[in-house]
Amino acid sequence: MRTGPGWLLAAAALPFFACAQEATIDKVHDTPAVRGSIIANMLQEHDNPFTLYPYESNYLLYTYTSDLNKKAIESYNWSDNANKDEVKFQLSLAFPLWRGILGDNSLLGASYTQRSWWQLSNTGESAPFRETNYEPQLFLGFATDYSVGDWTLRDAEFGYNHQSNGRSDPTSRSWNRLYSRLMAQNGNWLVEVKPWYVIGDTSDNKNITKYMGYYQLKIGYQLGEAVLSAKGQYNWNTGYGGAELGVSYPITKHVRFYTQVYSGYGESLIDYDFNQTRVGMGVMLNDLF
């Protein structure tokens, strides 16, 4: 597999973060969490040892897609009757395993993200789950405040990612990656880049990088109380990729109205090589900020 310069730069920077980050921030876990920083939030101390932290967004949407990938699920006895409307939801949580592993502003953490596409309206087929993706991670994270111009690097994360759909052949899909995640802020802007390097067996989906590329880019902007977001992945050599746009607005203190549009390849593992456009509306518990 090929690896881009972003991954090489991030890997080379790991010793620098381990040695230097302690001098740049005065005990992040003794101060309020930095807005939008996953790592700074996880460094906050709580009395309850079982406290879980949000990692990616947590949401529930009613969605409709332009096209359904029935060919990929033709081994299911209900595939011909699958509906284009689905409930899509994401659960994403993290837990700090060891705060201060490489200095006050570092941690060893684990996260678990699950995305599901549920045929809730398909009562004639007992409302099956068409696809669920399971994504555990183990990572080293650093909260930083290094600045270049008006931009401040807030999170630096280096870890291992496994993603699979938990199915047996012929619908089994999975891959393993080493990754880095760098997040920077400038006022109401947030930019995050997550390059990866694929490792291990990809026989279930040998050409997955053709459609999913070698990185994910995420951009967020806070406009008043609303949050506008965009993220996507793209392979510059093949011209394939996918993008997700989102808008959220608070309904209550802890619940936000959320609209999402996904277009392109790779919305789920079963659809990694399938092009579609999906529109959804629902609620969200946490956004980028």
Swiss-Prot record:
Hydrolysis of phosphatidylcholine with phospholipase A2 (EC 3.1.1.4) and phospholipase A1 (EC 3.1.1.32) activities. It catalyses: a 1,2-diacyl-sn-glycero-3-phosphocholine + H2O = a 2-acyl-sn-glycero-3-phosphocholine + a fatty acid + H(+); a 1,2-diacyl-sn-glycero-3-phosphocholine + H2O = a 1-acyl-sn-glycero-3-phosphocholine + a fatty acid + H(+). Residues 21-52, 100-105, 149-150, 187-188, 224-225, 251-255, 287-289 are periplasmic. One of its GO terms (biological process) is lipid catabolic process. InterPro entries: PLipase_A1, PLipase_A1_sf. Binds 1 Ca(2+) ion per monomer. In the dimeric form the Ca(2+) is bound by different amino acids with binding of each Ca(2+) shared with ligands coming from each monomer. The Ca(2+) ion may have a role in catalysis. This is Phospholipase A1. Ca(2+) 1 binds at residue 126. It is a multi-pass membrane protein. Its EC number is 3.1.1.32, 3.1.1.4. One of its GO terms (cellular component) is cell outer membrane. Its main location: membrane. Belongs to the phospholipase A1 family. Ca(2+) 3 binds at residue 204. GO terms for molecular function: calcium ion binding; phospholipase A1 activity; phospholipase A2 activity. SUPFAM superfamilies: Outer membrane phospholipase A (OMPLA). Homodimer; dimerization is reversible, and the dimeric form is the active one. Residues 66-84, 119-128, 165-173, 199-216, 235-241, 266-274 are extracellular. The chain crosses the membrane at residues 53-65, 85-99, 106-118, 129-148, 151-164, 174-186, 189-198, 217-223, 226-234, 242-250, 256-265, 275-286. It is an enzyme of class 3 (hydrolase). Keywords: Calcium, Cell outer membrane, Hydrolase, Lipid degradation, Lipid metabolism, Membrane, Metal-binding, Signal, Transmembrane, Transmembrane beta strand. The active site is at residues 162, 164. It is found in: Cell outer membrane. Residues 1-20 form the signal peptide. It comes from Proteus vulgaris. Its cofactor is Ca(2+). PANTHER family: PHOSPHOLIPASE A1.
